[in-house]
Amino acid sequence: LSCRDLSAQLSSLPHRATAATTTHTQISLRRAPAPRAPLTTAKRLQLPSAATRDDALASLVGQLEQNLTQDEEEDDLYLPDDASSARRRAAQKHQDELPARWREIHGSDDWAGLLDPMDPLLRSELIRYGELAQACYDAFDYDLASRYCGSCKYPRRAFFERLGMPDAARGYAVTRYLYATSNFRFPNFFSGRSRADAKLWSQRANWIGYVAVSTDEESARLGRRDIAIAWRGTITRLEWVSDLMDYLRPVADEGIPCPDPEVKVESGFVDLYTDKDPSCRFCKYSAREQVLVEVRKLVAHYTALGEDVSISVTGHSLGSSLAILSAYDIAESAANLSNGMITMGVQRAAVCVYSFSGPRVGNGRFRERFEGELGVKALRVTNVHDNVPRMPGIFLNEGVPEMVRRVAEGLRMPWCYSHVGVELALDHKRSPFLKDTLDPGCSHNLEAHLHLLD
C-alpha cells in the first residue's frame, strides 16, 4: 500500500464523532453468518468505512509490522545452512570469474593448486561436464523389447529438454549424434531377437555419444565458445568384449596420422573408434570420422567469427577411453585448427578431457605424445576403490620404475600401459551418505563420483 493510496483512503474517512452528532442505529438480531473465506493480503489491508482516521492508522501500522515480522521469520526458516549449500553459493559467486579463468580450469597449468583443496569453480565445472556424460546413459535405449534398442531415445534438437536438464538445454545445442560398431565376429548384441525383426533401425550400430556447442548466452558466461563431446560408457555386450581385447596396436595402423609407430593404444578401444559398416547408414562412417568432421566444421565456423574456442571431451568408463582417444586424434589430426593445417601464427583450440573412472588407453609413448608434444590436457576423476582405472596393465604401468618399463616396451611386451593427465582421487567411504557394499559396480558408478565431487 503506497503512501498516496493511504492518504486517499484516510481523507475519505469521517472525523471522530461528537456527542451532538452521535446517532444510534437499531441492530436487528440475525443468525450468525457463515464462515468467510480467508482474506487475501490486499483485502486485509483495506480500511473499514466506519473506522476513524486515528484508529485506522494505528490498525494499519500494526498490521504492517506484523506482516514484516512474519516475512522475516519465513526467510530464516528457509535459509539453507548445510555445507553443501554453502559450497554451491561459493561456486555461484565464483562463476563471474570463469571468463577470466577458463584456461586455468581447462588445465593450462595442469590444475596446480586447484585440487587440494578443491577449487569451487573447478568443482562446479567438473560436475557440469559429468552431467553431460551421464546424459548419454539416461538417453540410451537398452530395452531389448524396443524396436530401437541401441539408439538414443530422444531427438537431437530436444535432447536436453526431454532429459529434464534445463540448464544444459539453455547452455548447449546438440549438433551431431555419434554412432559406433565393431567388425569382430562376436555374438550380435540383438541375438535375443528373431530374424523377423530385420527391420529394426540397425542390427550392428549403437548410439555412443554426441557433439554439442555452447549457445551465445552460455558462451558469454564461459568466456569462450565451447565444443563439448560426450561419450557413452559400457552397456552392451559387444562393448564389453571390446573392453577385454587387451593388447596394444600402433595408432598409425588405424589411419590416425601419427609420425611415430611406437605410439600404441589398446586394440579394442581403437577398433570401436575406427570401425565402420558401409551397409549401415548410421555407421557408414566410423565414430572417428563423424567426430572429426563435426569438430572441424564448428572450429572453422566460430574461429572465422573471431571467437576463442575450446574443445572439452568427457566420458565415463569406456566413454573415458573414447574421450582420451578422440581428444588425442583431434590434436594429432589438427582438427582443432581453423584451417586444419599446422602453420605459424595459427592458434589451436584448447583441447581438454574430463575423464571419469576410465581405464588406461595407451603405452608410455602415447602418454608422451598426448601430454608433451600435442599439449592435450586430461583430468581423471577416480574412486580409489574402483578397479577399472587399474586396468589394463595391472603389472606393467606408469607406477613401475622407468627402467623396468623401458625394458618391457623394448621387448615389445603387449601389456605395458600408462595413464595420461592428472588424477583426482576420491574415496566413497568418506561420504556419510554412501553405504559401503561388496558390489564393485557401485564404486564405478558415475553418479557416485558426481556426489563425491559435490
Where are these regions (language model features)?
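Serine hydrolase/lipase
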Residues: S2-E125, Y142, R225, P259, ...
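Structured beta-strand/turn binding interfaces of compact recognition modules in eukaryotic regulators
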Residues: S124, Y129-F140, R147, R157, ...
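Active-site- or binding-pocket-proximal scaffold segments within functional domains
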Residues: D143-G150, R156, M165, A169, ...
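Extended, Lys/Arg-enriched charged tracts that mediate electrostatic binding to polyanionic substrates
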Residues: P155-T215
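Beta-strand elements of modular eukaryotic interaction domains
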Residues: A198-Q203, G209, D216-A220, A300-A304, ...
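Short, surface-exposed "cap/lid" segments of acyl-processing enzymes
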Residues: S202-I256
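Catalytic nucleophile loop
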Residues: S320
